[in-house]
UniProtKB/Swiss-Prot annotation:
GO biological process: translation
Gene field: rpmC
GO MF term list: structural constituent of ribosome
Pfam families: Ribosomal_L29
PANTHER family on file: 60S RIBOSOMAL PROTEIN L35/50S RIBOSOMAL PROTEIN L29, LARGE RIBOSOMAL SUBUNIT PROTEIN UL29C
Lineage: Bacteria, Pseudomonadati, Pseudomonadota, Gammaproteobacteria, Pseudomonadales
GO CC list: cytosolic large ribosomal subunit
Cross-referenced HAMAP family: Ribosomal_uL29
Name by which UniProt lists this protein: Large ribosomal subunit protein uL29
Keywords, sorted A to Z: Ribonucleoprotein, Ribosomal protein
Family of the protein in this entry: Belongs to the universal ribosomal protein uL29 family.
Amino acid sequence: MKASELREKTAEQLNEQLLGLLRDQFNLRMQKATGQLGQTHLLSQVKRDIARVKTVLNQQAGK
């Protein structure tokens, strides 16, 4: 996911995407805790995506 793609979305769409990413992060953390997570890189990828969405939301709020 690129920041330029996120900037084209509305705040409502970004909030929906943020909630989905937070759910994904929770599920990945639970899989890691139970030893079921084979692709550990997904945790950091989702974490970065969350940061991107939050950054774009803050930029839009500042305008």
